[in-house]
């Protein structure tokens, strides 16, 4: 979604693209969506994914159980992280089960000139 990180720019709020997208969905379309899985910031070489605290818990548990059975228990942490204002929020607000797969804490170079491709890991991706 576009304009996810636009908050702070004069006249803009956060998560603009996903908010607009969900606002355009019909009631029947919303009812037809089983889940929304947001994959955000998953390229870090030291990837750790706690359970983002505003995400749908049952969906998280399903995904984390699958990850654990596939040997990714060291990445998908059995701990609750902080709530993140992210593109899953409008879907949650519309009643769609949603999770945010996001690496936290954010690395020191996040949103700086040092946030470059060399920080990404093919293994994490």
What are these regions (language model features)?
Residues 1-58:
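Acidic/histidine-rich catalytic neighborhood of metal-dependent amide-processing enzymes
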Residues 35, 44-125:
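Active-site-adjacent substrate-binding region
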């Amino acid at each position: 979604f576009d304009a996810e990180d636009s908050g702070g720019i004069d006249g803009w709020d956060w998560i603009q693209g996903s908010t607009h997208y969900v606002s355009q969905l019909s009631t029947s379309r919303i009812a037809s969506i089983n889940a929304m899985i947001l994959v955000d910031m998953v390229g870090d070489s030291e990837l750790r994914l706690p359970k983002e605290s505003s995400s749908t818990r049952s969906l998280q548990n399903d995904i984390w159980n699958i990850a654990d059975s596939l040997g990714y228990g060291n990445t998908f942490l059995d701990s609750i992280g902080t709530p993140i204002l992210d593109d899953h929020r409008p879907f949650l607000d519309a009643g769609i089960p949603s999770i945010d797969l996001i690496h936290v804490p954010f690395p020191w170079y996040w949103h700086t000139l040092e946030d470059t491709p060399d920080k990404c890991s093919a293994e994490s991706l």
